[in-house]
């Protein structure tokens, strides 16, 4: 009972699909707000859910970062121990945040993420897929792919 979405479905298709609009309007809205129409037409729901974290510091130019000193996300320094999180200087770990527009909605909807690698398939609840670490931010191994998302239909729920 629910809706399966392949990870390769475009964000535009997610935003405009009648079943998603009817049963999961928050997801349709989130997908419709991603970037520009051209990127929604080419970008996929799986790609949006697995986006790298963003850091206001790391997303600066190399000369800018070199002048200030390097960070945990991208040390670029032979002295990795010297790298700190410039977002939260007292933190021992990187605190870059998720930039996925659809991830919070998937967590709220109790979505399940279906991952696959050569050894098989596993299912991870959306709420357990994301970690509180800017560098090691997804609960998946490097050889795993997000292949589909299952959205459960909850009886009696009404969304506006």
Regions found by a protein language model. Name each.
Residues 1-160:
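C-terminal structural segment of proteins
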């Amino acid at each position: 009972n629910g809706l399966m979405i392949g990870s390769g479905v475009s964000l535009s298709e997610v935003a405009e699909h009648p079943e998603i609009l009817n049963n999961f309007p928050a997801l349709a809205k989130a997908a419709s707000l991603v970037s520009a129409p051209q990127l929604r037409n080419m970008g996929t729901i799986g790609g949006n859910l697995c986006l790298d974290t963003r850091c206001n510091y790391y997303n600066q130019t190399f000369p800018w970062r070199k002048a200030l000193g390097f960070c945990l996300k991208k040390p670029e320094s032979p002295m990795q121990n010297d790298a700190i999180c410039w977002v939260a200087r007292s933190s021992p770990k990187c605190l870059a945040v998720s930039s996925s527009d659809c991830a919070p909605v998937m967590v709220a909807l109790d979505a399940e993420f279906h991952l696959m690698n050569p050894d098989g398939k596993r299912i991870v609840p959306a709420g357990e897929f994301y970690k509180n670490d800017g560098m090691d931010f997804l609960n998946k191994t490097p050889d795993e792919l997000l292949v589909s998302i299952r959205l459960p239909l909850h009886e009696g729920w009404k969304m506006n």
